[in-house]
Amino acid sequence: MIFAITFFMGITSTLAAVLEPMSYYQYTQFQAPLSWEDITGKGLKQALDSCQQSFQWQRWNCPSQDFVQKNSKPEENSPNREDVYVAAISMAAIVHTLTKDCANGVIAGCGCTENALNVPCAHEPTKALEQYEKHFGSGSGAIGHNRRVVGALLQRSLEQECRCKQPGAVQGECQEEECVAVLKPFEAIAQDLLQMYDDAIQLEGASSNLKIMWQNIPLDSLVFMQDSPNYCERDATGLWKGTRGRQCSKDGSGSLEERLSCQQLCRVCGYRVRSQHVRTERRCNCKLVWGFRLQCDVCVQLERQYSCY
């Protein structure tokens, strides 16, 4: 009997500790110092995934090697359109990641002074941008302008997120709301950057008055200097493979880029479209046997695929 009472009291105290808001000391135990390696790694992975999804049906399809090369080479003041896009989405992803991690209380020394695990914390991209500039620099020329464009976009991407602090007497009613500014999901910001990529302005390399030139370019326009290479052809260094052998799609229910992919990837580049049936196997008709073992059939399917040759 004594054991049962002791056991019950132990469970009660444990539940109380879980349900009770964390003290500031307990809260800080979850935090770690700012690691640029960690933040950059998470941000660049998010940027690459978004880039490859956005350009899946384009002649330049954001190959991993080229993406890494564009991020690792020394800054150039004569970037092409794709250089500019990769730099912009990479910066946006890194700052977005840093902003959210700060607000969520993951990083020591930034974010709310209160317990962010119990109290909603506003996103502050301005502070994250300051940290980014301290670490990576502010850049000059086209690079500097485009970084300011990304910073302005992140500032415009704040929206109000509210939760009910004091419920009303009637179900579903709220007497008092608590609202904080949070960044839009990264996917929405990536769509804005993709539109900026399409609308980017090409500048001449020489200008009689660079200061006046930069002052006249709005902070919602990315700029680039050089024409893009011919992505139909294979790059001599292997950064992109050209469009020969690339798969295209004739799926009428897909996006406009997907529906036009055979035209843009094959015919415009001087290739023909080859159609072939490909045999694929997949698991199907799965069911649990004896309540714990998964048993499946193997279904064979013929799929029609299109490619450039």
From Swiss-Prot:
One of its GO terms (biological process) is neuron differentiation. The keyword Cell wall biogenesis/degradation does not apply. It comes from the Eukaryota. SMART domains: WNT1. GO terms for molecular function: cytokine activity; frizzled binding. InterPro entries: Wnt, Wnt_C. Pfam families: wnt (PF00110). CDD domains: Wnt_Wnt8. It is found in: Secreted, Extracellular space, Extracellular matrix. Residues 1-16 form the signal peptide. Keywords: Developmental protein, Disulfide bond, Extracellular matrix, Secreted, Signal, Wnt signaling pathway. Disulfide bonds join C51-C62, C102-C110, C112-C121, C162-C179, C164-C174, C232-C269, C248-C262, C266-C308, C284-C299, C286-C296. GO terms for cellular component: extracellular matrix; extracellular region; extracellular space. Binds as a ligand to a family of frizzled seven-transmembrane receptors and acts through a cascade of genes on the nucleus. Belongs to the Wnt family. This is Wnt inhibitor of Dorsal protein. It comes from Drosophila melanogaster (Fruit fly).
